[in-house]
Amino acid sequence: MAHKTALISGITGQDGSYLAELLLDKGYKVYGVVRRLSAPNVWRIQHLLERITLLQADLLDQLSLIKVVEQSRPDEFYNLAAMSFVPSSWDQPMLTGEFNAQGVTRALEAVRSVNTKIKFYQASSSEMYGRVREVPQTETTPFYPRSPYGVSKVFGHYITVNYRESYGLFACSGILFNHESPRRGIEFVTRKVTDGVARIKLGLADKLMLGNRDACRDWGFAGDYVRAMWMMLQQPEPDDYVVATGEAHSVQELVEVAFAHAGLDWQKHVGVDPKFLRPAEVDHLIGNPQKARQKLGWQPEVAFKGLVTMMVDADLARLSAGQLIP
C-alpha cells in the first residue's frame, strides 16, 4: 500500500506533536504548517524535525493555505491550529474569531479549491457547550458558548458541517473535551498546577495561586485523543464525534492528586487569586464518548490520576534538569 500523506496545521502545539508522532509511526509522510514572520516554537516537535517537513502558511491568509495544500498534496488535512487559550479570547475576541472561525473556512476553501478528495479533520471543543443544556454532553447537545473562544469554535464546527453537506467533502469534527499532557501550555490550569507542584517540591517556589478550584472538567490524555482524530478519517463516512472520558474532576481534585504525588500538603501552599477567575465560567462539562467508542472502537488508555502523576513527574524531571521553560 502506498504511504499516505498528512498535513497538520498547529503541528507545534500539544495535539499536533502527538498526532505527528502517531502518523509517523503509521508510515505517513507528515507535513506541518507553521506561521511565517515568527520563529516557530518547536520544542514539542524538536525530536521529529528530521522526519517531518514544515511549510509556512497562515490561517489568516487564504492563498498561503492553498499553496501548502498544493505543495503537500495530502490525503488527510488535520486543522488543529487555533487560538486555544480561553481567557485570552476575552482580550483578543476579534483575532480569536479570525483564527478559529474564518481560519477554518479558509482551510476548507483550500481543500475545496485544490482537491475535494482530501479528508479534513476540524478540532472542535467542549467549550462550545458552555452553559450546558444537558449532562453529559453528546454530539446532539445544543451549544451555548460562554466565551469568544467558544463562540468561534461553534462557527468552525458548523462551517465544517456545511462544507461536508454542501460540497460532499469528507470533513469531520472531533468535539474534544479537555485533554492534557506534559506538553500542555504552561498557561493551562493542569500544567500550571503540575509545574507549581514541581517548583514547590524543588524549593523554587512556595505558593501556587489559582482561581476557581470548584471548576470541573472532563480531562483526558492528549496522546489518546489524537488517536480518535486519526480514526475518524479512516471511517467509510464522515461524521462528528465527542471525544472524552465521561468523568469529571474538579481543579481541587487535580490539586490534591498532584501535591500528594509529590509528598506535599496542598493546604500549606495553595491560595486564591481573583485575577484568575473567568468573566463567565462554563458549567459541568462531561462528555459522553459512547458514539466514538462504538463506531470508532476508540477507548482512552490513561486515567485521570495517571495523567496528573505523569505531568508532575515530567515537570519534576524538567526542572531538575535546569529547564525552567517551557
Which residues fall in each region the model found?
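C-terminal substrate-binding subdomain of Rossmann-fold SDR/epimerase-dehydratase oxidoreductases
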Residues: 25, 32-33, 57-60, 184-326
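N-terminal Rossmann-like NAD(P)+-binding domain of SDR-like oxidoreductases, especially those catalyzing
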Residues: 1-179, 233, 302, 309, ...
